[in-house]
Amino acid sequence: MKKLRGRLAAAVAVAIGVIPLLATLYLLYWCPADLSVRQTGEQRVFGATYMTMNNPYFQMLDAQIRGHLELQGDILLTRDAAMDQQRQNQEIRELVDAGVCAIFMTPVEWDTSVEGVRIAADAGVPIIVVDAPIEDAELAACSVLSDNYYAGVLCARHLMSVRDSAKILLLEHITARSGADRIQGFKDTIYGHEGFEILGSGESDGQIENAMPVMERLLEDYPEADVLMALNDPSAFGGLAAIQGAGLSDRFLVYSVDGSPEGKAMVSSGFLTATCAQFPSRIAEEAVKQAYAAINGGCERKEVIVAVELLTEENVDQYGIDGWQ
């Protein structure tokens, strides 16, 4: 058991240290001052702004979008909102002023992000929403999203298939609709099933460094808890660290959404019970397709939903643990 806990502590420590480092290296080396490659007069310029680049998922999503655009001879200007909606609104204004032809956007907050979307809409610049929806979806040219609600459903179904009862804690990100939908899908699925009880929840903002202290407080308040449902892999890693620190690893099941390489490795090693995989490569491909449609007459669809899949110890190795699916 000490060896198992040591492996978990090492894995979480690596995740805590490596994720910010990767984000820094990404910004320094893959994204120069304007976060773009060289421009030429014949290239079309697209913009992108994500809720945070301190998350490998958004780094991967951006790299995939950039790759598709560069295959067409075009370029991408990327901005990091750093979990600040007002900053993101200003980034959209700056991208519009820079003359981009379309903007990919993952909103920081699903409701107040509308201000930024209106800035682009008023300037005739189409917005392609990726990963997390906005409150007024009609303002966007198209929204390309994972099936976030169903991701929560799949986690809950698995839990009910392996346990007759559960005392559950939630790690949430309520201002991001994608995270809220995952948790809602989970809650709706277990609702009314005797023996399955949600004891409490905490706001992690989807960040590993926030999730650990939040989970520590939840464990103090609800020492009888034995299941964690986290909105994403970074939150799950922080929650796992708190569980391990409290010596409760043996009794806890931990669920998450992302399917990150680190998350899949945790599932394969038995630390995570399951992670519901998103497919950033499919999201990026569809988002770029819709962006080109938007600047060439308009999108045929206002929303594209990309399927998710639950990864457990039984099937995770089919997807590989060295990269995203």
For each predicted feature, which ranges?
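Hydrophobic alpha-helical segments within soluble ligand-binding/sensing domains
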Residues: 88, 143-168, 180-181, 208-212, ...
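Short, solvent-exposed amphipathic alpha-helices that sit
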Residues: 57-74, 151-155, 178-196, 210, ...
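N-terminal Sec-pathway targeting helices
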Residues: 1-18
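Hydrophobic alpha-helical
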Residues: 105-121, 186, 199-200, 204-264
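An alpha-beta-alpha
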Residues: 46, 65, 153-196, 200-201, ...
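Flexible loop/hinge segments that line or gate small-molecule binding clefts
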Residues: 111-150, 161, 260-268, 320
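Extracytoplasmic "Venus flytrap"
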Residues: 45-64, 68, 72, 77-90, ...
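Hinge/cleft segment of the Venus flytrap/periplasmic-binding protein
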Residues: 10-15, 24-36, 189-190, 279-325
